[in-house]
From Swiss-Prot:
GO terms for cellular component: cytosol; glycine cleavage complex. It catalyses: N(6)-[(R)-lipoyl]-L-lysyl-[glycine-cleavage complex H protein] + glycine + H(+) = N(6)-[(R)-S(8)-aminomethyldihydrolipoyl]-L-lysyl-[glycine-cleavage complex H protein] + CO2. The keyword Ribonucleoprotein does not apply. The keyword Hydrolase does not apply. The modification N6-(pyridoxal phosphate)lysine is found at K274. It holds the Pfam family GcvP2_C. The glycine cleavage system is composed of four proteins: P, T, L and H. In this organism, the P 'protein' is a heterodimer of two subunits. This is Probable glycine dehydrogenase (decarboxylating) subunit 2. Its EC number is 1.4.4.2.
Length: 488
């Protein structure tokens, strides 16, 4: 029996006329939609929404939630995603009435406490990153990437340097990097990695030129390796007149140890929903603040949160600003959670976060390299990348290994990324997992490797114990069904 047979869609449960909620009687005159909208925007027939009782709705979504998997359910070693535990004190603080019940349209004088929190969060992020100013406006990581690149574009245009149309990105980069650069109007140039998994400095020198707007880097990179030549790379880019952009996806590996600003980066984006424990993995909301060096401050999105003698306020007087990038001022609830985390941990706690994240990753890497190929055999930072090429020769692919992990109640690691590693298995344990959990996962991975040798079919046909078996993911990606259509 599968999920489709036991759990119909909410639309399929609908019974015409069944009511789940009663609205109070209107205390304002009724008006017609046609009084406000053109006929072209008005439905000819009512929306086909499901009609259920409140109890039916509660049971439907509660049963669905029981089949979900999250950090609170079990180990979630999704590489490059930092699926760490989200402390519940964050949720308690975010639900304080003074935070949860305010509205962004309120007068600034009535939300001074909230503005103070945001300002203090900005100040903390300035210190953590080594930047000169931070804006909390971007809503997520890729949004922060795009915003940072738009600042760089505005900077070059302000200086009359319109020939700088290219952004250099490593071949190991996150996929959002080239996408963000393209959306920001840049051409993407790829710089190769060397045999050690690091940016090839010689190749960088070849591709940098007068048309270079920026170099986008993640440090440590997506292989979990620290770019030791970062200072030299910064000098190369700056001497050519370009800017250095820091993708903050992997900040968990260096937080409170080293700062991007001290490495030579001009723009930084952070993922507060990752590094600073805002819950993520369900599509949002996120928070992707960007930090900038002094010469880029004039181009920050408005408004800019400032502190004056009379209190906190938003400043719109930035004539060179790229303008708003989001209504209001960021995703406030996630920012509250991040602020709570930073204040709870303190500088010493954040340093321990980094140390344990790196320790856990190296411990797992050394334990697993006996059964899986390790393309870059060196000390890693917060994550590491194995290869399933050894298992592929036995007829077992990386995707099979990932599916088999589901039978053991583990979320699979990131697979087939970075693209420069064949049959990639990207593992990020984070700092919040115990040695017992790490050992359990290691034992399972070793068991699966042995199964690939002795009984490959059990891995190839996995998962066996999940409510939903293996799906046709290629078909789902290429021919998605994004809305319900009732059969006639």
């Amino acid at each position: 029996m599968n999920l489709e047979e036991t759990m119909p869609l909410v639309f399929e449960r609908s019974i015409p006329g069944r009511i789940g909620f009663s609205l109070p009687e209107s205390d304002v005159p009724e008006t017609k939609a046609s009084d406000y909208f053109e006929q072209a925007y008005i439905r000819s027939v009512p929306a086909d929404l499901p009609e259920l009782s409140e109890l039916e709705i509660m049971r439907h979504y509660t049963n669905l939630s029981n089949h979900n998997f999250g950090v609170d359910s079990g180990f979630y070693p999704l590489g490059s995603c930092t699926m760490k535990y989200n402390p519940k004190i964050n949720e308690k603080v975010a639900r304080f009435p003074g935070f949860a019940n305010i509205h962004p349209n309120q007068p600034e004088s009535s939300v001074q406490g909230a503005l103070e929190l945001l300002y203090d969060l900005q100040t903390s992020l300035v210190e953590i990153t080594g930047m000169d100013e931070v804006t909390l406006q971007p809503a997520a990581g890729a949004h922060g990437e795009w915003t940072g690149l738009m600042l760089i574009r505005a900077f070059h245009e302000k200086n009359g340097d319109t020939k700088r149309t290219k952004v250099i990105i490593p071949d190991s980069a996150h996929g959002t990097n080239p996408a963000s650069a393209a959306v920001a109007g840049f051409d993407v140039v790829t710089v190769k990695s060397n045999e050690k998994g690091l940016v090839d400095v010689a190749d960088l020198k070849k591709v940098v030129g007068e048309d270079t707007a920026a170099l986008m880097l993640t440090n440590p990179n997506t292989l979990g390796l620290f770019e030791k030549d970062i200072v030299e790379m910064a000098e190369i880019v700056h001497e050519a007149g370009g800017k250095l952009y820091y993708d903050g996806a992997n900040l968990n590996a260096i937080m409170a140890k080293v700062r991007p600003g001290d490495m030579g980066f001009d723009v930084v984006h952070l993922n507060l929903h990752k590094t600073f424990t805002g819950p993520h993995g369900g599509g949002g909301p996120g928070s992707g603040p960007i930090g900038v060096k002094k010469e880029l401050i004039p181009f920050l999105p408005t408004p800019v949160l400032t502190k004056k003698e009379e209190g906190y306020s938003f400043d719109y007087n930035y004539p060179d600003s790229i303008g708003r990038v989001k209504p209001y001022y960021g995703n406030f609830g996630i920012n509250v959670r991040a602020y709570t985390y930073i204040r709870t941990m303190g500088p010493d706690g954040l340093k321990l976060v980094t140390e344990y994240a790196v320790l856990n990753a190296n411990y797992m890497m050394r334990k697993l390299q006996e059964a899986y190929d390790l393309p870059f055999d060196q000390v890693c930072k917060h994550e590491f990348v194995l290869s399933g090429n050894r298992q592929k020769k036995l007829g077992v692919r990386t995707v099979d290994i990932a599916k088999r992990l589901l039978d053991h109640n583990f979320h699979p690691p990131t697979v087939y990324f970075p693209l420069i590693v064949g049959e990639a298995i990207m593992i990020e344990p984070t700092e919040t997992e115990s040695k017992e959990t790490l050992d359990s996962f290691i034992d399972t991975m070793l068991k699966i490797a042995k199964e690939a040798e002795e009984n490959p079919e059990i891995v190839q046909e996995a998962p066996h114990s999940t409510y939903v078996k293996r799906l046709d993911e290629t078909r789902a990606a290429r021919k998605p069904i994004l809305r319900y259509q009732k059969e006639v």
